[in-house]
Amino acid sequence: MANEFRVCDDCKAPNLKTLLPRLKKLDPDAVIKIGCQSYCGPGRKKTFAFVNNRPVAALTEDELIDKIAERLKSR
């Protein structure tokens, strides 16, 4: 089963221009869905993505990518 990344295009923390290519690099076969994730509170303060329906958040995009990579390895 392919991994799924879900990111918000409404929240201020995630920068989709830089985040999306990095997610594709982590898993080129993953499904990426863009839209409101109803995660507004944390999404204003931290960059985040949902990985296979689980939220992953970090203060920086680099930390987020590291956390997502770990999540994918443990799967």
Swiss-Prot record:
Belongs to the UPF0741 family. This is UPF0741 protein GTNG_3358. It comes from Geobacillus thermodenitrificans (strain NG80-2).
